[in-house]
Amino acid sequence: MAKNNAVAGFNALNGVELNLFTTDELKAIHYATMDVLMNPGVQVSDPEARQIFKENGCEVDEKTNVVKIPEYLVRRALQLAPSRFVLWGRDKKFNTVQECGGKVHWTCFGTGVKMCKYQDGKYVTVDSVEQDIADIAKLCDWAENIDYFSLPVSARDIAGQGAQDVHETLTPIANTAKHYHHIDPVGENVEYYRDIVTAYYGGDEEEARKKPIFSMLLCPTSPLELSVNACQVIIKGARFGMPVNVLSMAMSGGSSPVYLAGTLVTHNAEVLAGITLAQLTVPGTKVWYGSSTTTFDLKKGTAPVGSPELGLISASVAKLAQFYGLPAFVAGTOSDAKIPDNQAGHEKTMTCLLPALAGANTLYGAGMLELGMTFSMEQLVIDNDIIKMTKKALQGVPVNEETLAVESIQKVGIGNNFLALKQTRQLVNYPSDPMLIDRRMFGDWAAAGSKDLASAAHDKVVDVLKNHVVKPIDADILKDMQAVVDRADKAFRGM
């Protein structure tokens, strides 16, 4: 099923790798999905999208809006979708390559509606506002293990007052030089997003297409629906040259079968339907195979994201994406904890490591708490350390002539140590070295003030927000970008 330039199930990790399926099992999921795409099919609410499907050979029922997508169209779409594309940052040092079987990347979670604020050991939750987005963007700009920025929370202070999603486009771009991934786009406003990015490039739309500093995420409605908004984000994103992330949020036992394999079939059908629409609209559109799929807790009535099932599903999706030769964007580093505590540390490490070992190209979840509803800047700083240590684990144990170190062992001999060895001094940074996770003995820790991890993280947040400098946008360019937001606000208010 893989493309000619990709190998099914291939993972470019040099160290440890997690394999969950045989090739036959991946094929079984694929063929089950093809059955579902024809019976019952997918409900497509957008007339323009239905017409695109119809013109390309799909059976369309205009009474029910159900589209039946044959396998040959899916295969053609998968051949057209690129296995590799670059996400540009405003500073090219932050460019990241999304590639099937390539490096694992991390981004922050989105989109929550609350902030967990920390001060003097106390926690409060408040509605998120536009300034929170700016602050988190600055923090992510600093965080070395956050590769690009995803919309973490919504600007609830603007809701009902202006074009909220357009504000949520400029504010991140202005406050981080890393690539911006919009997780809450509105189909009818994609033109404004394009105009903001084009203004950044001095009005050069072709340059904006070649060097996308902006991308979008949309979610099918489980089970098996593509809403008008989702379709318009796909169609317009494809036409404007924006990378598009088709991300299912199926819930096992709720909006998909209780069996995880059946959930993967539902998930797969939704994502492949969206990817097929993108390729039918503009062949070669850059797409992610996305997942925030998890289980439905039948006893609590919630959709946990700190569960082992979330980690397993995300790892499974990574393998499906590799099977299709596509970059995978999955939930990971996630938690159901309400504050940065022991539960958060355990759940985030578990849900981070599983999909990373499976070779997902991007994990999103950093900074997130409370089943995805709440964001904590202190947790983001802690997650920056968790991610750094995960990266070290992914390296595995390299075995070669240098690392076997026979000459060093013979030189040091019996009963001595390796501390004074030149090789040891040269590789002082070789062991894992977290920034805040504390490895001192109790006495030294107590003498330094006995700060717990959350307190240390809070100090770092304060320091970064005060002192970190983000690469600025030229004042005249920023003025032109702001003019697009002002235009959108006027349209929203009917002026």
UniProtKB/Swiss-Prot annotation:
Q: From the UniProt record, list the coiled-coil ranges.
A: none
Keyword field: Methanogenesis, Methyltransferase, Pyrrolysine, Transferase
Q: Which residues cross the membrane?
A: none
**InterPro entries the record matches:** MttB-like_sf (IPR038601), MttB_Methanosar (IPR012740), MTTB_MeTrfase (IPR010426)
* Superkingdom of origin: Archaea
Specify the enzyme's EC class, one word: transferase
Query: What Gene3D superfamilies does the entry give?
Result: Trimethylamine methyltransferase-like (3.20.20.480)
An MF annotation (GO) of this entry: trimethylamine methyltransferase activity
| Reaction equations catalysed | Co(I)-[trimethylamine-specific corrinoid protein] + trimethylamine + H(+) = methyl-Co(III)-[trimethylamine-specific corrinoid protein] + dimethylamine
Q: Which GO terms describe its biological process?
A: methanogenesis; methylation
- Pathway, according to UniProt? One-carbon metabolism; methanogenesis from trimethylamine
What EC number(s) has UniProt assigned to this enzyme?
Answer: 2.1.1.250
Q: How the protein assembles, per its UniProt entry?
A: Can form a complex with MttC.
Summarizing the function annotation, the protein's role is: Catalyzes the transfer of a methyl group from trimethylamine to the corrinoid cofactor of MttC.
Member of which family? Belongs to the trimethylamine methyltransferase family.
What name appears for this protein in its UniProt entry?
Trimethylamine methyltransferase MttB1
Q: Which organism is it from?
A: Methanosarcina acetivorans (strain ATCC 35395 / DSM 2834 / JCM 12185 / C2A)
**What taxonomic ancestry is recorded?**
Archaea, Methanobacteriati, Methanobacteriota, Stenosarchaea group, Methanomicrobia
The gene is mttB1
